[in-house]
Every structure is written in C-alpha cells, then in structure tokens.
C-alpha cells in the first residue's frame, strides 16, 4: 500500500536520532541526493472560519514529472505548530534522504487534538487575551484564534480538499496517509478511523492511542481497566487534563467516540493500515496505551 509505506518510512526517518561528530571514510562516491522543496500555503477554512497556514513538501520529481503523487498528512503535537516537523523533525532532509516519492502536508492544529470541540470557540476573548497555555512561541492571536473550533472537519475536509485542488495529488483514499506525534499521533489515528473515505493508512509516534485506558501501568494483557468517569480525566497532568476535558466535554461517550482503541474494534480486516511506536523514555504511560491498542487490533 503506497500510503502506508510512505507514512512508515517518513515517520522513522524524521524521528531517528541525529548523529553528530562522526568521521566516515568514503570508499566510493555516493550518488547525489535529489532535493525536494517546501511550499507555504495560506487558505480559508470554512470549518474554523479563519485563514490557516500549512507547509507542503514537494518531492524532487514534482517539478519535472507530469505524474501525480500520494500525500502524507503530518500532524504536530501539543505546544507545536505547522513548522515543527520542518524545524525539529528535519522533514525535508529526511524525505530527501529516503527518496520519498510523496508529498507531505504539515498543517496548523493549534491545541485542538484535531477534534470538533464540544466547547464553542470564543474568538473575541481569544484575541483579547493574546496568550495561550500551550501555543508555541511563534503563535499570535491571528494564527491561533478561530471562530469555530471544528478542527476535525478542518483537517479531514477543508485541508484535504484544498491540497487536492491546489497540487498534483492522487486524490483517492488509497494514496492518502496520515501520521503524527503525541497529540498529532492521536489525531492521525482518530481522523483515519473516523474518515475511512479519506485515509488508507495512519501512524502514531508516542501518541494518545487509548483515551480511556486507566491501567495497569505497566500494561498487562487481560487486566485492562477502562475509565467510565471522565470528570477528572488527566488530573495528574494538569493543565493538559483540563484542556482535554474542555475539548471532549463531561460525557464519557464523547471520549469513546474519538478513542482510537474503541474505534479500532469497528474496523474490518485490511480496511486501514496502522503503524504504532512509542519512545522508551515516555513519562505519560503512552507506551501502555500503544501496547493495548496493538492487542485490540490483533484480537479482532
């Protein structure tokens, strides 16, 4: 599956450690690396009712070959923005290094968890405060504040439609994958599982893969506890918990409707290609959620 191969290769390349101060003696010259380029786009999202910016990596052959290209959507984590994968993930260099023959779209997800929030946006107050708990240092009110907090619709509909209209894409689900880090890993799985007409592959790197997973820590198969009361969800990691509760609301059904581990039980065999990983030094128990989701998928 083209989209899955692109997602897995790209995520591995962007998240592998950078090696410095290493001397290598070349035995023979390596072929030159073909370089892609990064384009910056601003468009109006109907779902958010504001203008949003995204970056798109165009592979080396985009300017010379008449063909169309598959697309990977790459989502940033909490506190990040649309430049994170370029500045910190070194996306262009990683994509060039593996010869990625796909476009990579990096949108601005603010602190939304890529969900249509149950709490309405307060645009006027957001602009007035001009300060946001998790917004990156580059964020201004103009780039952060929205009139409607419908981020799921913004990514799955507005963004995908704009990219397909603006660039030479293969505009089918089979040629679209979505991946992300942390909040973005959750967003990638959730969006792909809830919009199977849009995406055929999803990848989560240290993501919130099971919103309602309540233990044990470490994970033990067959002993899983799932939360039934979300009134204090994430209380041990405030203010992140308060943000998530504001987005999903007080109803456990809202959490369950967006929980990748719950959504995974509805998938048919071969319906969605999925890649999961998590760092060994994670401090939020996310590796337990990844292990649980893996077993949910394996047991279907």
Where are the predicted features?
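C-terminal motif of bacterial Sec signal peptides marking the signal peptidase cleavage site
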Residues: 11-13
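Non-catalytic cap/lid and distal C-terminal segments of serine-dependent acyl enzymes
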Residues: 15-300
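Short, surface-exposed beta-edge/turn micro-motifs
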Residues: 7-8, 101
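Sec-dependent signal peptide recognition
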Residues: 1-7
